[in-house]
Design a protein with these regions (language model features):
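Alpha-helical coupling/stalk and coiled-coil linker elements that connect catalytic or binding modules
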Residues: 1-435, 443-472, 494-495
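ATPase nucleotide-binding head domains, primarily ABC-like/P-loop NTPase cores
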Residues: 380-383, 387-605
């Protein structure tokens, strides 16, 4: 556990706690002051009715009312600070829990679990305690989907150069965000109270863009007519006050404005109100994210490009907020009459909406996609910050399987994890034997999950790891499916069939298998495993296979230079000693009988 980082999170959480005490005390003072100033204003109004020549009391009442409005504004701002501090306190506490091994405060990504995926099911990428849950700090459903998509990518495409360039760019982005702690916490705090529902936003924005209005509102002459009408209206007021025009002229003109604007625009304005109201809270969340991103300077090419793609988004969402504010201003009968008479507000709202629709129709989806990626990158950067024991991998450009690891271990294990050196050569196969619980499966998962991290530009858990770009497929956790009448053995065959179907001769592949054909008898399992490995060895494939079948290790003698034996050995004595170190050779000791004797006769052990 990173003690310095833990101390930092504790310090920040305590700082927020102290700030909250101060802000809440201030809030109570503001409330009492608001009540007092409002009562004082009423008192001066009462004095005005009781005293003669008491015009001064009206000025005092006005002053008290202005003071009330000032304090009210301060109270609103103070309340925002309280909400921000509460959110940050929750963020810091969540990170403290994470460093202590408690991930319950983060979504596990159960919806992304897919037993048919080439590797995510076997590598514990999703579900409780998974890599996703440890990494996920997204504040939007779209960001969560984007992070899941990154962790589920199937590599090995023919566009190797472009993919390698993107991975290296991602490494720089992740490293930069991993050092941007104040930014990370502030970003994460924006999703504490309520996550942004990206699907709802996209659906509502689609409805917004599809909404059509009569050609009348698109006519440029309408704009000039409105300008001329309002100019004439205000001039009539001035002339009426000066006695140069009939006193009723402004009144009748105002009534005309109200009728014209209300009858022409009210129905359409209500449609706009309903459309925008659907996304108001979500858009407000995106607006806060955009303000934070836009005020932050980034150095990496990927982050700068993302920020550039978001140009205009903040202004766009602010305009939506402005339209909604104008709708709120005319939300009662008095507002409807006043704002339509003096500003033709219903027509103005429709025209503002049309202008927004025309200006930003083609860009909103791109902005949402960019924000989703930014959201996912913040989670990756936060993982980089928390896991400072990890290092960035070296990406090889060779068009073959390259996997050279120095002191590699599984990221889910503590810092006391036993690390292993291991090198995988292209077109070669590694048979790993060993007793139960000796470390075979954990080692296989260490190979797979660290490759997954490297391909996403994330730090790996090793002193050094050099990998190339290749297709990864695993078969470690096959399950039966009684609902569809699929037995365990049949499920294994289907998994191997899917493996074969995923292979391409022009793309190097690494397969990681744990106990092939577990669902059959020992001899059949051995013969079937040999047959499968003999066939697969003719393809552009490299493999690491864990097995209890010691006979399978004889393939090293039959295919010299192609098959290699490695093992996790145990020492049997009064107790069992597990080294968890991989060595060359074939395992000599097994522990099933030893452990079973301990269960049947506990006094023996």
């Amino acid at each position: 556990m990173n003690k310095d980082l833990t101390d930092l999170y504790h310090h920040k959480a305590e700082e927020m706690s102290t700030m909250l005490v101060s802000l809440r005390n201030r809030s109570r003072v503001f409330i009492l002051t608001e009540i007092g100033s409002f009562l004082v204003a009423i008192g001066f109004v009462v004095l005005y009715t009781l005293l003669d020549n008491a015009a001064w009391t009206l000025f005092c009442a006005l002053a008290a009312l202005l003071f009330y409005l000032y304090i009210r504004r301060r109270d609103v701002l103070n309340d925002r600070k309280i909400k921000t501090a509460e959110a940050l306190q929750r963020v810091y506490q969540n990170e403290i829990d994470y460093l202590n091994g408690n991930f319950s405060g983060f979504e596990a990504g159960e919806q992304y679990v897919n037993p048919q995926h080439p590797y995510t099911f076997d590598m514990d990428v999703f579900a409780a305690g998974s890599l996703f849950q440890r990494m996920n700090r997204t504040i939007s459903t779209g960001g969560s989907d984007q992070l899941a998509a990154c962790l589920s990518t199937e590599w090995g495409s023919a566009k190797r150069e472009e993919l390698i360039r993107q991975i290296r760019q991602r490494m720089v982005s992740v490293d930069e965000l991993g050092k941007a702690e104040p930014f990370l916490s502030e970003f994460k705090s924006l999703g504490v109270k309520e996550r942004i529902n990206t699907e709802e936003v996209l659906k509502a924005l689609t409805d917004v863009h599809r909404q059509s209005f009569p050609k009348f509102f698109h006519n440029p002459l309408l704009r000039y007519f409105c300008y001329a009408d309002l100019l004439g209206f205000y001039v009539s007021i001035v002339l009426s006050v000066m006695g140069l025009a009939p006193s009723l002229l402004p009144l009748w003109w105002g009534i005309f404005n109200f009728m014209f604007s209300f009858l022409c625009g009210h129905k359409h304005m209500r449609v706009i109100s309903e459309l925008i109201a659907k996304v108001h809270t979500q858009v407000d969340g995106y607006l806060r994210v955009l303000k934070l991103v836009n005020k932050t300077e980034f150095k990496s090419a990927e982050l700068q490009a993302l920020k550039q793609k978001l140009a205009g988004a903040e202004e766009s969402f602010e305009q939506l907020e402005l339209i909604l504010q104008k709708i709120d201003n005319r939300s009662n009968e008095v507002g409807v009459f006043v704002f339509n008479s003096f500003a033709l507000i219903d027509i103005t709202i429709v025209r503002l909406f049309l202008r927004w629709q025309h200006t930003y129709e083609q860009r909103t989806n791109e902005w949402i996609d960019s924000l989703n990626l930014f959201d996912a990158l913040v989670s990756m950067g936060n993982f980089r910050l928390n896991e400072d024991r990890a290092v960035q991998a070296e990406i090889s450009e060779e068009n073959k399987v390259v996997y050279e690891a120095k002191n590699l271990y599984h990221p889910f294990l503590s810092e006391k994890a036993v690390a292993n050196d291991f090198t995988i050569h292209d077109h070669e196969y590694y048979i790993v034997t060993g007793a139960n619980m000796a470390g075979k499966s954990t080692f296989l998962r260490s190979l797979g999950i660290n490759y997954l991290l490297a391909m996403n530009g994330l730090p790996v858990f090793a002193d050094h790891l050099k990998v190339s770009l290749f297709h990864l497929f695993t078969s470690m956790r096959t399950t039966d499916d009684l609902t569809h009448g699929i037995s365990y053995f049949n499920a294994e065959l289907l998994r191997l069939k899917k493996l074969l179907g995923s292979l391409r001769d022009d793309v190097p592949s690494l397969i990681i298998l744990d106990e092939i054909l577990k669902g059959t008898n020992s001899l059949d399992k051995l013969n079937g495993s040999r047959l499968f490995l003999q066939y697969i060895a003719e393809r552009n494939v490299t493999g690491v296979i864990a097995t209890h079948d010691l006979e399978l290790s004889k393939m090293e003698e039959e295919y010299v230079g192609r098959f290699h034996n490695y093992c996790f050995e145990i020492e049997l004595g009064e107790d069992i000693t597990y080294s968890y170190k991989i060595t060359k050779g074939v395992a000599r000791n097994q522990n099933a009988t030893f452990l079973l004797k301990g269960i049947l006769n506990p006094n023996r052990i």
